[in-house]
UniProtKB/Swiss-Prot annotation:
Its cofactor is Mg(2+); Co(2+); Mn(2+); Ni(2+). The keyword Transferase applies. Mg(2+) can be partially replaced by Co(2+), Mn(2+) and Ni(2+). This is Pyrophosphate--fructose 6-phosphate 1-phosphotransferase. Homodimer. Its EC number is 2.7.1.90. PANTHER family: PYROPHOSPHATE--FRUCTOSE 6-PHOSPHATE 1-PHOSPHOTRANSFERASE, PYROPHOSPHATE--FRUCTOSE 6-PHOSPHATE 1-PHOSPHOTRANSFERASE SUBUNIT BETA 2. Coiled coil: none annotated. Belongs to the phosphofructokinase type A (PFKA) family. PPi-dependent PFK group II subfamily. Clade 'Short' sub-subfamily. Non-allosteric. The keyword Ribonucleoprotein does not apply. The lineage of its organism: Bacteria, Thermotogati, Thermotogota, Thermotogae, Thermotogales. Diphosphate binds at G12. It comes from Thermotoga maritima (strain ATCC 43589 / DSM 3109 / JCM 10099 / NBRC 100826 / MSB8).
Length: 419
C-alpha cells in the first residue's frame, strides 16, 4: 500500500496556494505516494473527523496552478491552542494514515505545524510552505513570501485607478491596505502607484494616538493644497491600528475590538480608513470647511487573485522542494520550512524564525532606515522640516489650517521626524 501524504491550508488565502497544491501532488504521485487533500485547514482534524478529505490525482490538479483561491479551502483553527486539541489533531492524522504532512500558511500555521511535528514524535514528517500577502515572514536573503508580488500587482492597479478618479473628481481617497504588523504591502503599492502619501505601522511608536496619525495625513493634505491641489490618495497600512491603544479604538463609535483564535486583533473589523476619514472631516468642520474624502479598504480583493507568473514559478519550486524534503532530500530534519535561497531549495528548522522571547514566529517588518523606505518617502507629499523652518511656507500652511505659525509648527513638527 502506498504511503500517504496529506496537504492542508491554514490562515488567509494568498495567490499561489493552488500552485503549491498542484506541484506537491504531482511530484508526490510521481514518486509513488498517495495524496490526501485535507479540507479547511486543521478545523476538522481537531474535531477528530476523518471524512473531510479528498484523494487527489494528477488530473485533479494539473491545471489549477493558474487559479486563485484554494481547492482545499482554508481556516484559522489553531490546533495548538491546548494539549487536548493538539493530541486530537495528531491522532486524527494517524487514523488517516498520514505519514507526511504539507502545511501551507503564514506564521500561525507554521507554529501549528511545528507543534504537530513535535507531538507526533517522528511518526509524521511535516514540511511547511510559508505564504502571506503581508510579506512579514523573515525568509532568507529578503525573499518575498509567495502571494505578495501578486497582491502588490493587483492592488497597485486598484490604487492607480483611484488616483485617476481622485484627480478627476477633486477629492481625497483614504485607502487602508492589508498588513497586520508590517507595512510591506502598503509601502510597495504606494511606491509603485506613486500614491500621494503612504503611512505604515513601522513609522509610529507603540501607543500612537488617533490624533497623531491624523496629523500626518492632515499635514500632507495641507501641503498638497498649498501646491494648488485638493485631490490625493493616502495608502494606509492597516497594522497602524495594532500600534494604537485598544481602549481608544474601542471608544470610537461603531468600532468593535475583537481577537481571532490566535490572539490577534480582527483588523478587518476595525474600519481604519473610515475612522481616519471622520477624524479629518471633523478637523475641517472645526475650521469652517468641508473636505471630500472617500474611504476604501483593499485586502480581500487580493487574497484569491489569479497569481502572476512570478508567484506561479516560485510556488512550483516550493511545492517540489517540500516533497523532495519529505522523501529524504536536502535535510534529515523531522520537519521544517521550505524556502528558496539564491535560486536553490533549502529547508530551515521550524525554530529558525522563532523569537526566543515570545516563542512565536518573528515578524519581518519594513526597515524604515533602508534606502528602499527612504526612496519611497522622498516621492511622497508630506510635511518636511524645511516646510516648517521656512517662514513664508510656514505662514501659508498655518493660514490654511487657521492657526498661528508657531502653533502650527509645534503641532505638526512630529510629522516631519524620520523614524
Amino acid at each position: 500500500m502506498a504511503e500517504r501524504l496529506g496537504i492542508l491550508v491554514g490562515g488567509g488565502p494568498a495567490p499561489g496556494i493552488n500552485s503549491v497544491i498542484s506541484s506537491v501532488t504531482i511530484e508526490a504521485i510521481n514518486n509513488g505516494l498517495e495524496v490526501i487533500g485535507i479540507y479547511d485547514g486543521f478545523k476538522h482534524l481537531v474535531e477528530g473527523k476523518t471524512n473531510m478529505v479528498k484523494k487527489l490525482s494528477i488530473e485533479d490538479v494539473s491545471r489549477i496552478h493558474i487559479e486563485g483561491g484554494s481547492i482545499l479551502r482554508t481556516s484559522r483553527v489553531n490546533p495548538a491552542k491546548s494539549e487536548e486539541t493538539l493530541e486530537k489533531t495528531v491522532q486524527t492524522l494517524k487514523k488517516l494514515g498520514i505519514k507526511y504532512l504539507v502545511t501551507i500558511g503564514g506564521d500561525d500555521t507554521a507554529f501549528s505545524a511545528s507543534k504537530v511535528c513535535e507531538r507526533s514524535k517522528g511518526e509524521i514528517k511535516v514540511v511547511h510552505v510559508p505564504k502571506t500577502i503581508d510579506n512579514d515572514l523573515p525568509l532568507p536573503e529578503n525573499m518575498p513570501t509567495f502571494g505578495f508580488e501578486t497582491a502588490r500587482h493587483v492592488a497597485t492597479e486598484l490604487v492607480y485607478n483611484l488616483m485617476q478618479d481622485s484627480r478627476t473628481t477633486n477629492r481625497w481617497y483614504f485607502v487602508a491596505m492589508m498588513g497586520r504588523e508590517a507595512g510591506h504591502l502598503a509601502l510597495g503599492v504606494g511606491k509603485a502607484a506613486s500614491a500621494t502619501i503612504t503611512i505604515i505601522p513601522e513609522e509610529f511608536k507603540e501607543g500612537v494616538t488617533l490624533e497623531e496619525v491624523c496629523d500626518v495625513l492632515d499635514g500632507a493634505i495641507l501641503k498638497r493644497k498649498l501646491m494648488g491641489r485638493d485631490d490625493g490618495v493616502a495608502v494606509i497600512g492597516e497594522g497602524i491600528a495594532e500600534k494604537m491603544d485598544p481602549e481608544e479604538l474601542a471608544n470610537i463609535p461603531g468600532v468593535i475590538v475583537e481577537k481571532d483564535p490566535h490572539g490577534h486583533l480582527r483588523l478587518a473589523e476595525i474600519p481604519l480608513a473610515t475612522i481616519l476619514k471622520r477624524a479629518i472631516e471633523r478637523r475641517y468642520a472645526e475650521r469652517g470647511e468641508r473636505i471630500h474624502i472617500v474611504d476604501v479598504t483593499i485586502g480581500y480583493e487580493l487574497r484569491s487573485a489569479r497569481p502572476i507568473p512570478f508567484d506561479i514559478v516560485y510556488t512550483r519550486t516550493l511545492g517540489y522542494g517540500a516533497v523532495r524534503f519529505l522523501l529524504g532530500d536536502y535535510s534529515d530534519l523531522p520537519g521544517g520550512m521550505v524556502c528558496v535561497v539564491g535560486g536553490r531549495i533549502k529547508i530551515l528548522p521550524f525554530d529558525a524564525f522563532m523569537d526566543p522571547k515570545t516563542g512565536r514566529t518573528k515578524v519581518r517588518v519594513v526597515d524604515v532606515r533602508s534606502e528602499d523606505y527612504r526612496v519611497a518617502r522622498k516621492y511622497m507629499i508630506r510635511l518636511e522640516k524645511k516646510d516648517l523652518e521656512d517662514p513664508e511656507t510656514l505662514e501659508k500652511l498655518a493660514k490654511l489650517a487657521k492657526m498661528e505659525p508657531e502653533e502650527f509648527k509645534k503641532k505638526y513638527w512630529h510629522t516631519t521626524e524620520l523614524p
